[in-house]
Structure formats: structure tokens, C-alpha cells
């Protein structure tokens, strides 16, 4: 009997890359003329980004700078879940952005449905925060990878442990 091939579908954000992107974004904010004298800041608290600025307009500018730096570092911005803009101390506004690590149950079901609609001989298992796909044929697995990549999912997915 031939050995089954498999791979895992995961959704991870590399925290060191996020830290590097925050540092370069803060450098740009300090050097930009339109941010001179403003109280703009970005902090990483565990897996939550806290954006702070003088007003909502500057907060959007801070967010744009951060997103551009995250994209340069290949950090998936789909995995950022922005909260509401709220008032903070000292006439500033704050917004929290949560980094989503792992695949939650709803997105795992969506991925499962995408794979089942293909009607290939593959098996899927939801394991905690990842989805394992197993099949006899590697061609089927590559077709699954192509289908999941082309699907419009609310999170960014990576494929690991391809065996």
C-alpha cells in the first residue's frame, strides 16, 4: 500500500517580523514632517497592536504607514482585526488591532467546504488551529493548495509539512 501524502494549512503571523515592521514604522513617523510634534505611537502588547495618535486623521496615517511596513516584511495584513477608535488620555485617540494566530472553527469549516466541493479523494481533519489534508495522490494535494489559495478567505493561510 502506498503511503499517503499530507500537508497542514495554518495561519501564522511571525511576531519578530511584526516587531521589525513596528520599529521601521516608528522611525518613519518620527522623521515625517506632518507628524512633527504629534503624539503618535505604535505598541505591541502580546498579540495586540495599539495605535495611538492625536486625532482620527493622524491615526489613519499611522495605520497606513504600519500597513506599508508590514507588507514589505511579508506579514499578512488580512490577519489584523481592527477594533473601534476610542478616546485615550491627553486628547489622543487609540485603536487596537488584534493579530489572529491560527484558524478558528468558522474558517476551518469554510476551508473544509472549499475542499469538499472539489470532489477529490482527500481527507481533511481540523486539529486545534490548523487543518490537515491527506490524500494518496500528490497531484490532488497540489490542486487543493491551488483552490485554497485562490479562495477569498478572511485570513491569510500558509501550507506547511508537505510530505
UniProtKB/Swiss-Prot annotation:
Any GO MF annotation of the entry: nucleotide binding
Keywords annotated in UniProt: Nucleotide-binding
InterPro entries named in the record: DUF520, UPF0234-like_C, UPF0234_N, YajQ-like_sf
Pfam families: DUF520
Alphabetical list of SUPFAM superfamilies matching this protein: YajQ-like (SSF89963)
Task performed by this protein: Nucleotide-binding protein.
Family: Belongs to the YajQ family.
NCBIfam families, alphabetized: PRK05412.1 (NF003819)
Protein's recorded name: Nucleotide-binding protein BA_1166
Organism the protein comes from: Bacillus anthracis
Lineage of producing organism: Bacteria, Bacillati, Bacillota, Bacilli, Bacillales
